[in-house]
Amino acid sequence: MNATQDMHPELGREVPVGRIDRELRQLWAEDEARTNASLINFAIYSEAPGSLERNSRVVEELTREHACRAMLIYIAREHPEPTIRAWITAHCHLRAGQKSVCCEQIAFALTGQMKGRLRNTVFAHLNSDLPLTFWWQGELSPIFSERLYSLVDRFIIDCASWGDPAAGFASVLAALADSPKLVVQDLEWTRTFQFRVSVAAMFDDPVAQAAIPSIQTVTIRHHPAHRLAALQILAWLATQSKWSEGRGLQLDDARRPGAVENFHFESRGGREVSARLVSDPSSPALGTLEIVAGDVSVEIVREAGASHLCRLL
């Protein structure tokens, strides 16, 4: 059975790979009222069935604000036969009642062994004048190699989806050492952003700032699927406060609902700092961050489904 035979029509017009550029020119010639806009190459890679359709909807929303040439890539590596199919479409949005501003999308479905097909065939359709942002969805596979990341300017990952985070980060660190221009963005780290900003803002208060050397306990409540976000913000707190580690922050512990993990640090003044990570299925990615230092207690809370944080001092 062809692993790519059932594709949603929203992917657009199926075209022979060798005719992609010609078909794109024809697409624009069919409607002169549309304007082609592109500021970056934006590629989304996945090995999950159904990802092309899901990611096409992602690109449709993204192009409302960000002009790009989008490339969707799905690969079924375990399929016995090497095949490749391609579709083209344009996501168009009206701007202030003027012409439709449209962004090109090329979707590729590949099966079987790659043997250079990703770089030589798929990447041949990048706009060579524009930087490449590459969003890798899911666990890193052997396809993540120098032949890929040497072409990438910004590499987006989400370590929350990794079954082996230690191996994944080792691969990313090796790529960074090999390709200094590469910029890596982890969506799990991005999920901690508002908490980090809130902590920094609260410790601008003179009372809270004076209490930093006296911090005794840190408690972080998180969703089981986002344990790494909790570890990342704990590591950030330890780094900012210059605590020394009593026990390494293990990446490979099981994700267990209701599980409590305990960590111990030593402050710059020699005090013991105890940290707890509490796994709660009812929590958003990060639900609560509580810091206690003597009589001072700082708490940052996000309720499930809320778009804002509450800060208590």
Kindly give the residue locations of the regions a language model identified.
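Acidic, Ser/Thr-rich peripheral helices and adjacent loops at domain boundaries
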Residues: 87-96, 153-162, 174-183, 256, ...
